UniProtKB/Swiss-Prot annotation:
Record Gene3D superfamilies: Ribosomal protein L30, ferredoxin-like fold domain
Keyword presence, Chloroplast: no
Stored PROSITE patterns: RIBOSOMAL_L30
Keyword set, alphabetical order: Ribonucleoprotein, Ribosomal protein
Any one of the GO CC terms: cytosolic ribosome
InterPro entries per record: Ribo_uL30_ferredoxin-like_sf (IPR036919), Ribosomal_uL30 (IPR039699), Ribosomal_uL30_CS (IPR018038), Ribosomal_uL30_euk (IPR005998), Ribosomal_uL30_euk_arc (IPR035808), Ribosomal_uL30_ferredoxin-like (IPR016082), Ribosomal_uL30_N_euk (IPR012988)
GO molecular-function term, one example from the UniProt record: structural constituent of ribosome
Protein name as annotated: Large ribosomal subunit protein uL30w
């Protein structure tokens, strides 16, 4: 028997299979390396954005302090610019509620007592709030409230499912196409009522708050009358602390 005949002949089908497996392994390796690189770049981008937002918030706070100081020196007082963002909490149930009011509460996504949602201030939302005012309380949330609500009680809507915001990938999946890829992006979009506020707000599931520590005073009375309903302006932040 010659040397050539003694060598094992590998079938062509086996060679093709081996080649396919090697190509698949190489492609998988390249895919993993690309994903690793992409994740590293995304983490860097998220870090830089968070840093940028923090700087932006601090500058805004310093500017506000300076404006108040200047107004005081001139013998006047500083008037806050008109708010763009509201936080609304439903404080009453369904007893003796008329169909139109019930419908508006549903449109506002306030289906249960102690549900809370963000709203952009405009003529339409103000008109709706006036209609349901005996059943809700609302005001102007500050950065601390927005952050604490989203980080502590935030759930997103993914495939019509209520999904906890456990990491940035949840936000990226839901809002990445709008350039909102992390929780800090989401907070910034809500707080500044940005160009994609509607999408960001619809992504957020209504907040389910707890009954306030110390309870409610008089749900049927307006806030300015010593009750709980209606506009409490900046004092909504104190209520958020008690219910979060």
């Amino acid at each position: 028997m010659t040397e050539a005949e003694s060598k094992t002949v590998v079938p062509e089908s086996v060679l093709k299979k081996r080649k396919r497996e090697e190509e698949w392994a190489l492609a998988k390796k390249q895919e993993l390396e690309a994903a690793k690189k992409q994740n590293a770049e995304k983490r860097k981008l998220i870090f830089n954005r968070a840093k940028q937002y923090s700087k932006e918030y601090q500058e805004k706070e310093r500017e506000l302090i300076q404006l108040k100081r200047e107004a005081k020196l001139k013998g006047g007082f500083y008037v806050d610019p008109e708010a763009k963002l509201l936080f609304i909490i439903r404080i009453r149930g369904i007893n003796a509620i008329d169909p139109k009011t019930k419908k508006i509460l549903q449109l506002l996504r306030l289906r249960q007592i102690f549900n809370g949602v963000f709203l952009k201030v405009n003529k339409a939302t103000i008109n709706m709030l006036r209609r349901v005012e005996p059943y809700v309380t609302y005001g102007y949330p500050n950065l601390k409230s927005v952050k604490e609500l989203i980080y502590k009680r935030g759930f997103g809507k993914l495939n019509h499912q209520r999904t906890a915001l456990t990491d940035n990938s949840i936000v990226d999946q839901g809002l990445g196409k709008h350039g909102i890829i992390c929780v800090e992006d989401l907070i910034h979009e809500i707080m500044t009522v940005g160009p994609h506020f509607k999408e960001a707000n619809n992504f957020l599931w209504p907040f389910q708050l707890k009954a306030p520590l110390g309870g409610m005073k008089k749900k049927r009375n307006h806030y300015v009358e010593g009750g709980d309903a209606g506009n409490r302006e900046n004092f909504i932040n104190e209520l958020v602390r008690r219910m979060n």
